[in-house]
């Protein structure tokens, strides 16, 4: 791999496994091109349920935090992240749970404190491009996912302002901020393909009826040659992903590749041009 001089891509995610389900193949592609790739994982995933029956043992439950960090290391090695930074918060769980009320949870952290931690990473790593979550998350409104959006938006602006968080390093203004999106149309295509192949779809008709909003996107990244990365990285999260799950692995790889040849993103903020663009490169306008 020949490093691209100075190009850096930073992804902000809520929990271990989010980096695998969202944009993993894109990160793998840019890493292979020589772009420096940085993951910021905001929590340790301590409140997550064990979703793979084979991993649901007393030993794993007793040490779930350490297990999930080890899974994260395995997944990031598969994807090709050059560095992983843990932001240091505890998984907030869902509203109304004990985990959500803990003072060390991400959801309870003062916004400025969490933003400063992210700003510190941005100023140190100097990424031109940041990937994060959209503001619209009705399909899975986890408090930590919502908070990832909040801190990313503020940190994108604050990192370049020398008057904000002056102790967090020399100011650096990233150029572009993207949302990782998964339009409802893609869910509909996957659901239809299950039915076409005579297979039971993991998506209920009730759930499909709720998928009414199609996230707009500006940027389509060709993941040819890297389309298997997402599945391999997901399987590294053995507590969270059942390798027999029809949701993740029900369709044959060649069929999924046909439906999902591109990772999709929406340009939300840009210092190098308008955001209403059509692109096939996250670094468009930067090289």
Where are these regions (language model features)?
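Active-site rim/loop-helix segments in enzyme catalytic domains that contact anionic ligands
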Residues: 1-125, 254, 266-269, 274-276, ...
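Metal-dependent de-N-acetylase/amidase catalytic core
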Residues: 1-12, 97-287
């Amino acid at each position: 791999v020949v490093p691209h001089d100075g190009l850096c891509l930073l992804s902000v995610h809520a929990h271990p496994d989010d980096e695998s389900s969202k944009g993993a193949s894109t990160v793998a592609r840019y890493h292979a091109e020589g772009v420096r790739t940085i993951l910021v994982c905001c929590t340790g995933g301590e409140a997550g349920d064990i979703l793979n029956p084979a991993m649901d043992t007393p030993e794993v439950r007793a040490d779930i935090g350490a297990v999930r960090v080890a899974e994260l290391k395995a997944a990031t090695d598969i994807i090709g992240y050059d560095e992983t930074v843990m932001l240091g918060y505890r998984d907030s769980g869902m509203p109304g749970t004990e985990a959500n009320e803990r003072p060390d949870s991400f959801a309870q952290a003062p916004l400025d404190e969490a933003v400063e931690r992210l700003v510190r990473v941005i100023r140190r790593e100097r990424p031109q491009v940041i990937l994060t979550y959209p503001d619209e998350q009705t399909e899975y409104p986890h408090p930590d996912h919502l908070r990832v959006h909040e801190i990313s938006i503020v940190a994108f602006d604050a990192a370049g302002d020398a008057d904000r968080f002056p102790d967090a390093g020399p100011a650096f203004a990233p150029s572009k901020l993207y949302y990782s999106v998964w339009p409802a149309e893609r869910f509909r295509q996957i659901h239809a393909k299950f039915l076409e192949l005579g297979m039971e779809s993991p998506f209920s008709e009730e759930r499909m009826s709720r998928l009414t909003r199609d996230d707009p996107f500006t940027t389509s990244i060709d993941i040819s040659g890297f389309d298997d990365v997402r599945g391999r990285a997901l399987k590294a999260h053995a507590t969270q992903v059942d390798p027999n799950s029809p949701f993740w692995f029900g369709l044959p790889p060649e069929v999924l590749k046909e439906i999902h040849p591109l990772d999709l993103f929406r340009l939300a903020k840009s210092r190098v041009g308008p955001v209403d663009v059509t692109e096939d490169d996250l670094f468009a306008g930067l090289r």
